[in-house]
């Protein structure tokens, strides 16, 4: 058995390829397609956040490069967690709407230091993770009337 065959066998068992009627080649093509579909974020996210983030001793170009690397890493880690923990083929990356709000409204508009605003985002993320693991997320979603859910989806 070749290395590729053993790899295909491992991933096939791990992710249930037979049940999903797929194979490693199809999943690799799907992954590349997903990455290319969301790759615009690697350019736009650093451009948006770079307008608000200044780090002493680093040029704006260096800050933009750091933000691009962090964008790539966060998208890769989030997508891998979704794949291996939830067994779902979802590509996750930073959202431009919230990034624009963070950069232009909170940091530049309200004058809050970007470090403080980023700390608030981290705390918010931790709260959402706790709400999900405790099981409150489902109760909160169930409490929202369907018309509100539909209108929020349409508004976004």
Which residues are covered by each model-predicted region?
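Short, Lys/Arg-rich, polar N-terminal cytosolic tail immediately upstream
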Residues: 1-22
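Early transmembrane hairpin of solute transport permeases
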Residues: 29-156
């Amino acid at each position: 058995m070749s290395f590729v065959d053993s790899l295909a066998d491992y991933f096939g068992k791990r992710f249930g390829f037979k049940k999903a009627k797929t194979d490693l080649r199809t999943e690799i093509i799907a992954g590349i397609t997903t990455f290319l579909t969301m790759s615009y974020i690697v350019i736009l996210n650093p451009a948006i956040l770079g307008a608000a983030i200044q780090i002493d001793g680093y040029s704006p170009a260096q800050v933009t490069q750091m933000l691009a690397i962090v964008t790539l890493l966060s998208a890769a880690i989030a997508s891998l967690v979704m794949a291996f923990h939830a067994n779902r083929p979802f590509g996750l990356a930073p959202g431009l709407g919230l990034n624009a709000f963070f950069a232009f409204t909170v940091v530049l508009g309200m004058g809050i230091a970007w470090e403080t605003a980023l700390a608030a985002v981290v705390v918010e993320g931790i709260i959402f993770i706790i709400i999900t693991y405790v099981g409150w997320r489902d109760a909160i979603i169930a409490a929202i009337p369907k018309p509100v859910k539909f209108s929020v989806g349409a508004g976004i």
